[in-house]
Amino acid sequence: MKIVVIQGPNLNMLGIREQNIYGPMKLEDIHKQMKGFAEQNKLEIEFFQSNLEGEIVDRIQECIGDADGIIINPAAYTHTSIAIRDAIAAVQLPTLEVHLSNIHQREEFRHKSLIAPVCAGQIVGMGPFGYHLAMVGMTQILSEVAAMREQQAKAQAAAQQK
């Protein structure tokens, strides 16, 4: 199974910008930890970061037929991007939204996520550990999806034998 991790604007600056909010860990280090989890759990993982909304939309759309789930930190686009929201809704893949900081404790304009309503879940305020939680959550979601598909296949096979 394959998970695509999509990182939004300014996340390439982690470890440099606003460490009091986002912490000292660099994006590469977060990805290294996620890759380790993926390897331990026999998952394929791919990382993508862009500061451009259209590139993020393109990558989400490219997940059709290529990925089983998406973990996304849309960063500032969380609060403004109908395009990213619509792309996630269109691909119909399990998606988890992650934020390093607790967006609900920050400036009022950050409180509303346009993305969350089309996601399976949202993890906020856990720092880099939030990505680990997202990996655990996505692993569970994908296992449940696989089990449901297996049950459906068995039911179809049984119905065809009758």
Swiss-Prot record:
Swiss-Prot/TrEMBL site (Transition state stabilizer) positions: R17
GO MF annotation terms: 3-dehydroquinate dehydratase activity
CDD domains, alphabetized: DHQase_II
Keyword Amino-acid biosynthesis: yes
Keyword Hydrolase set for record: no
Keywords attached to this entry: Amino-acid biosynthesis, Aromatic amino acid biosynthesis, Lyase
Listed EC numbers: 4.2.1.10
Catalysed conversion reaction: 3-dehydroquinate = 3-dehydroshikimate + H2O
Annotated family: Belongs to the type-II 3-dehydroquinase family.
Protein name as it appears in the record: 3-dehydroquinate dehydratase
